[in-house]
Amino acid sequence: MELDGFIYILVGSTFGLIVRMFIKYISGKKKIFYSNNILIVNVLASLFLGIFEGLNITNKNLILFIFVGFLGCFSTFSSFIYQLFNLIREKKYLILLIYYAEVILLSFLFFCLGYFITLTFIN
């Protein structure tokens, strides 16, 4: 990868981090589901991923900026896994199953929503 590719990833990840921290800030301590900002960020990242996939982006630098940089830094898969681990450690198995299903299903549904919205209204 050339130096400009790293720069696209760096700039994209910077914006992804800023948006993620903004969502964390505005969500505060109010829990919408089991976990507030991690669920919100993962669902939004899935929606954005669906939208961008529907746009069929082929520009290599834009792919690095959006998919690798922005969405890679914006989404919180490692935080999701850490929360699942903590639920196992705390022996909260029912909450673990509900939270797992909630994140996976909502993320998948919002990916599909973003993809089909893009196909319907933009393409």
Curated annotation (Swiss-Prot):
Activity regulation as described: Na(+) is not transported, but it plays an essential structural role and its presence is essential for fluoride channel function.
Keyword presence, Transmembrane: yes
Annotated residues for binding of Na(+): G72, S75
A GO BP annotation: cellular detoxification of fluoride
A GO term, aspect molecular function: fluoride channel activity
One GO location term (cellular component): plasma membrane
Membrane-protein topology: Multi-pass membrane protein
Keywords carried by this UniProt record: Cell inner membrane, Cell membrane, Ion channel, Ion transport, Membrane, Metal-binding, Sodium, Transmembrane, Transmembrane helix, Transport
Catalysed transformations (reactions): fluoride(in) = fluoride(out)
UniProt xrefs under InterPro entries: FluC
Keyword Cell membrane appears in the UniProt entry: yes
One Pfam family recorded for the sequence: CRCB
Record localization: Cell inner membrane
Transmembrane segments: 3-23, 38-58, 62-82, 94-114
Family indicated by similarity: Belongs to the fluoride channel Fluc/FEX (TC 1.A.43) family.
Function: Fluoride-specific ion channel. Important for reducing fluoride concentration in the cell, thus reducing its toxicity.
Protein name: Fluoride-specific ion channel FluC 2
Lineage: Bacteria, Bacillati, Cyanobacteriota, Cyanophyceae, Synechococcales
